[in-house]
Every structure is written in structure tokens, then in C-alpha cells.
Design a protein with these regions (language model features):
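Conserved glycine-rich beta-strand-loop-beta hairpin in the small C-terminal domain of fold type I
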Residues: 270-274, 290-296
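N-terminal Rossmann-like NAD(P)+-binding subdomain of aldehyde/semialdehyde dehydrogenases
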Residues: 1-56
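Residue-level recognition of oxygen-bearing side chains
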Residues: 23, 99, 128, 181, ...
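Residue-level signal for inorganic ion chemistry
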Residues: 28, 89, 120, 141, ...
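Rossmann-like NAD(P) dinucleotide-binding subdomain of oxidoreductase/dehydrogenase enzymes
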Residues: 47-184, 302
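ALDH superfamily catalytic-core signature
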Residues: 148-283, 304-306
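Glycosyltransferase donor-binding loop in the core domain
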Residues: 57, 243-246, 297-300
Length: 308
């Protein structure tokens, strides 16, 4: 698993355990412990109109669940939904992202060893396979990925009135108020933003801070980048890479060299982009027109918290 994650995303063994394998083990342990109680019938109050009868909730599986997982945390975000779907009594079709082929092969090997294909099956492939699967009538669809594909998933599901869970990306700001502990805020922002090279759906997309603290916040962020990744992050063996050339080019094109105050370096050969901070950014800049999903952190300011 570690070697596959290293090849796909450049993750270190520590990061792989902290953000993927360890969390999967935790979920397995939790569901093994709690599934028996979750599966029990639970007595509930009976409405007066049904007086003299008894009412209860009886948990039951949906049936066949389609899990479509992303490439950024390919092991965690494939296996965790699988664990929960199985615990709820469902059969599952797994469709991992085509962008993480090495991890996909490991997952398929594990599934083939542990499950009958009539119970859990893995479908590998790209857009054609996604389309083919979405044309089928599943009882539940669990999708993690972009808003664009999420709309397609919901549209296809609506044809069969299939319930869905959509965990989608977006431009989520980290708002820093002027009373904040800037040293602590910077440490947490740098960790959350540049973990997995910014390829995290819950990472702060950009900073929106009080204009009075912007300069000091940027200084603290620069200190934390050096502390966490060293003076030359691209030479840090624990610093990962962008998933593929397409996304490397997309992220690289969002960087305005004239607004870079930290980082900006890149290595096309290894698909790495150094932790980057951009200042004097406006909401009209290219970097603010889409989810960044990479190690680029724009800093914007507001005059009052009400404005933010």
C-alpha cells in the first residue's frame, strides 16, 4: 500500500499511515465494535392514531451500492465507504479513479482475496466505465470528487430516483480574524494546506484575513513552511507530488510570478510544485476562478468581518 501511494502521489510512509492506512484501520475497528448495536431494532414512540400498537425502527440495507472514489486519498476514500456499506449489509461495486493506478491494483488485489465478486467487485477504467456504471440502476451511489462530475452523477441517479451522497470540492476560505493567534493559525494553515501537496478537499483554498494582520500572517506562514518542509521543499523526500502532468500544468498556470511572495518553484520532471504563497490577489485573478487543489495559497483581505 505504501509503495503504491508513493508512486501515485509521492506520499511518505508516515503520511500514508497518518492520512490513509491508519484511518482505515480506525474505521474498521469502529464498525466491528458498533455494527451489532447499529443493526438492532430500536423501539420508538407510537403516534396516538396507532394506539395499542408498537412502533420500532428496523435498519435495513439499501441493496447494491456504487462507490466512486477519488485519486487524492485513493486508499482511504475507497476503503472507508466500502467498510460502512458492508457494515450496513449492502453489496458494493467499487469504481476507483483512473488517476491512481498503482493504488487501484493493490485495492483490487485485496478485494479479490477477501470477497466473492458477487458481494464486492472492483471496476477499473476511465470516463467510459464511469458512464457505463452510471447508466445502471444502483440502490445507492456514494461519490467523492469534483462538482462537474458530481452534477453528472446526480443527473444519472435522478433517472432511477437513486439516493446519493456527494462529497464535492469547492473554494473554501480560511478566515483569519485580527484577534487570532497568528503563530498558531499559520502552523495549522500550513499543515492543512500543503499536506498531500494541497490535493485535499478540505484544505483551505485561500486565506481571507483582516487587512491589519495580513503582513504578519504571511511572515508567520513563511516561517512555518520553512519549519515544516525545510528551505528547499522540492528536495524534501517527504514532500509529495502532483497526481499527473495535466493537473501539474493546470496548477502551474494559476501562479502569477509577480504576486508570489514565497515558493513558486517547480520541477516538471517530478511533477512537484513548492509550497507557494501569493499576495495582492483579487477575486478576478485566475487563481480565484476555480478550486486550486494544489500547493498554492492566495491571500486576500477584508476591512471588516461583516464584509467577509
Amino acid at each position: 500500500i505504501n509503495e503504491a501511494l508513493k508512486r501515485d502521489l509521492g506520499k511518505s510512509n508516515f503520511e500514508s499511515y497518518m492520512c490513509e492506512v491508519g484511518l482505515v484501520l480506525s474505521e474498521l475497528t469502529y464498525m466491528i465494535r458498533h455494527t451489532p448495536s447499529y443493526a438492532k431494532e430500536k423501539t420508538v414512540l407510537t403516534p396516538i392514531a396507532q394506539f395499542a400498537s408498537r412502533s420500532y425502527k428496523k435498519p435495513s440495507p439499501y441493496g447494491v451500492v456504487l462507490v466512486m472514489s477519488p485519486w487524492n486519498y485513493p486508499f482511504l476514500l475507497t476503503i472507508d465507504p466500502l467498510v460502512d456499506a458492508i457494515a450496513a449489509g449492502n453489496t458494493v461495486v467499487l469504481k476507483p479513479s483512473a488517476y491512481s493506478p498503482n493504488t487501484n491494483r493493490v485495492i483490487e488485489s485485496i478485494i479479490d482475496e477477501c470477497f466473492d465478486p458477487h458481494y464486492v467487485a472492483v471496476v477499473n477504467g476511465g470516463r467510459a466505465e464511469n458512464t457505463s456504471l452510471l447508466n445502471e440502476h444502483f440502490d445507492y451511489i456514494f461519490f467523492t470528487g469534483s462538482q462537474h462530475v458530481g452534477r453528472e452523477v446526480m443527473a444519472k441517479a435522478s433517472a432511477h430516483l437513486t439516493p446519493v451522497t456527494l462529497e464535492l470540492g469547492g473554494k473554501s476560505p480560511c478566515i483569519v480574524e485580527k484577534s487570532a493567534n497568528l503563530k498558531l493559525a499559520a502552523r495549522r494553515i500550513v499543515f492543512g494546506k500543503y499536506l498531500n501537496c494541497g490535493q485535499t478537499c478540505v484544505a483551505p483554498d485561500y486565506i481571507y484575513c483582516d487587512k491589519e494582520i495580513k503582513d504578519e500572517l504571511i511572515r508567520q506562514i513563511q516561517k512555518q513552511i520553512k519549519k515544516q518542509f525545510g528551505s528547499t521543499p522540492l528536495n524534501n523526500k517527504n514532500y509529495g507530488k502532483i497526481i499527473n502532468e495535466k493537473h501539474f500544468t493546470r496548477i502551474h498556470n494559476l501562479i502569477d510570478p509577480n504576486k508570489v511572495v514565497c515558493g513558486g518553484d517547480s520541477n516538471p520532471g517530478t511533477l512537484q510544485i513548492a509550497p507557494t504563497v501569493m499576495d495582492h490577489v483579487t477575486f478576478q485573478d485566475a487563481v480565484m476562478q476555480e478550486e486550486i487543489f494544489g500547493p498554492v495559497l492566495p491571500v486576500l483581505t477584508y476591512d471588516s468581518l461583516d464584509e467577509a
